[in-house]
Curated annotation (Swiss-Prot):
Keyword Cytoplasm in annotation: yes
Keywords: Cytoplasm, Nucleus, Ribonucleoprotein, Ribosomal protein
Location(s) in or outside the cell: Cytoplasm; Nucleus, Nucleolus
Annotated GO biological process: ribosomal small subunit assembly; ribosomal small subunit biogenesis; translation
Disulfide bonds: none
General function of this protein: Component of the small ribosomal subunit. The ribosome is a large ribonucleoprotein complex responsible for the synthesis of proteins in the cell. Part of the small subunit (SSU) processome, first precursor of the small eukaryotic ribosomal subunit. During the assembly of the SSU processome in the nucleolus, many ribosome biogenesis factors, an RNA chaperone and ribosomal proteins associate with the nascent pre-rRNA and work in concert to generate RNA folding, modifications, rearrangements and cleavage as well as targeted degradation of pre-ribosomal RNA by the RNA exosome.
A Pfam family: Ribosomal_S11
Name of protein: Small ribosomal subunit protein uS11
GO terms for MF: RNA binding; structural constituent of ribosome
Entry similarity comment: Belongs to the universal ribosomal protein uS11 family.
GO cellular component: cytosolic small ribosomal subunit; extracellular matrix; nucleolus; small-subunit processome
Length: 152
């Protein structure tokens, strides 16, 4: 027995970093999950099964100050970055799933939702279906701060 070990070369695994092969007129769909709260806006693109992330950018990654994270400007910048990366990877069309905080929180999307959607459409991405997936409670837990009770 010699004291030397066999060294195996590491395997290189690339997940969706290669371009998706398709013709020029073919539409390759992804799913854009837009989560717009009043504190931040997330634009997260996955494949159709929503299992594998293609790209995720937030409004906070695009601006310096905390108060601007949820602004329409930050959402627009995030959506433009997402569209650019999607085109590099060969995704040409998106189904949109729009989400607000929901549950005990606000059920209306934040200020960045509409501008993010508009920026995706203007940057050349084809839009398939738009769906609101905000979680709506059927009977929820108690809201914070004695919600609007005892007002005389």
């Amino acid at each position: 027995m010699s004291g030397k070990k066999e060294v195996k070369a590491p395997k290189v695994v690339e997940a969706l970093s290669a371009k998706i092969p398709c013709g020029p007129s073919e539409l390759v769909f992804g799913v854009a999950h837009i989560f717009a709260s009043f504190n931040d806006t997330f634009v997260h693109v996955t494949d159709l099964s929503s299992k594998e992330t293609i790209v995720r950018v937030t409004g906070g990654m695009k601006v310096k100050t905390d108060r601007d994270e949820s602004s329409p400007y930050a959402a627009t910048m995030a959506a433009q970055d997402v569209a650019l990366r999607c085109k590099e990877l060969g995704v040409t069309a998106l189904h949109i799933k729009l989400r607000a905080t929901g549950g005990n929180g606000s059920k209306t999307p934040g200020p960045g939702a509409q501008s993010a959607l508009r920026a995706l459409a203007r940057s050349g991405m084809r839009i398939g279906r738009i769906e609101d997936v905000t979680p709506i409670p059927t009977d929820s837990t108690r809201r914070k701060s004695g919600h609007r009770g005892r007002r005389l």
